[in-house]
Amino acid sequence: MHRTKISAAIAIISVATLATSLAYGATAIPLPASAPADKPIGKLEQVHAFYDAMPTGVTVTETGRIFVNFPRWGDKVPFTVGEIRDGKVVAYPDLAVNKENPKDPGDGLISVQSVVADGKGRVWLLDTAAPGFASPRPGGAKLVAVDLATNRIVKRLVFPDNVILPGTYVNDMRFDLRKGSEGTVYVTDSSLSGPGAIIVMDIASGHALRRLNGAQSTSVDPAFVPVVEGVAVLGDGPNGTRKPVGVASDGIALSADGKTLYFSPLSSRHLYAVATELLNDSKVSEQQLAAAVQDLGEKGASDGLEADAKGAVYAGDYEHNSIRKRLPDGTWQTVAHDPRMLWPDTLSIGPDGYLYFIVNQLHRQANFNAGHDKREKPYSLLRLKIDAAPAPTH
């Protein structure tokens, strides 16, 4: 009996030893490059490579001119707005305009976050007057229109005090030149510290309304944690802690008929829409307006948005290195996906049927990586054929 137990124990030990030997004897090799992998979508073309300051915005005019902007966030920025000419970026409209006037914040360009061509021979420059995300300089946050025929400034609209808060960061804009005697512009406030909002301004008078102030649709999703390249994007929190980056209403697009405004907070995966008729009507209360906003569901986390003349809406998806397209029937499809699309930022549709967009590795900035700047130059302006025209503005 004793011998039987010993024999059984020896057999068990032998089997275990053999299994262990087989396990340790297995040979591991580096994963072959030929192993099944994520497949890119869309044929991307590089329009320009940036080896200096990081760009955020791009716009393509009705004649094909391309403008970009460089906010003053810490990089060396000799000019905050430029035009790509003959393969180089040059200050626009000139170097002098790109310098802050300390005596008059409403004069020179301080820190431009967005550039948008209005389809009627002008390019508009959106000046945050908030370098480094500081509080905007009093009287400095403004819209500047440049005539494309003369390359001269033809209009300055300083945002009135009733729409600019201490934490305001005007981010992006869209124009409807059919509404009002000279048109209407819609601007997102993507505040990092205060309430988000949509600013509605009459171009003729400069009169402005602050709408959806602090509404759920313009605010940071409190449960949202952005994950890019497999890593949570964190910023400074209270008492030296780190917390998910919180940026309010950012991307914006206007439907081809001007009746619907699409928008989304950067720190959210939802797309929202509201009727511009209600947005422009000061008699509609904030509660009524907030109740009229449509939540169109998840689209991925976006920085920039854009709309085409066929009724589609395009949205960057920075967590998945992608651009998505919402068809008029509400269905979504991915039109571009590539591991090199590190943070698709602003989108713009050119007259050539291409979707142009900036890729700038925004999430690799030092303030999101405990002081370590992980960006690798160049940043890129890319384009993708979509066979669609931009949504009309007039």
Predicted region positions:
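Beta-rich, blade/repeat-based domains predominating
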Residues: 51-63, 103-126, 163-185, 195, ...
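Blade-loop segments of beta-propeller domains
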Residues: 87-132, 136, 155-163
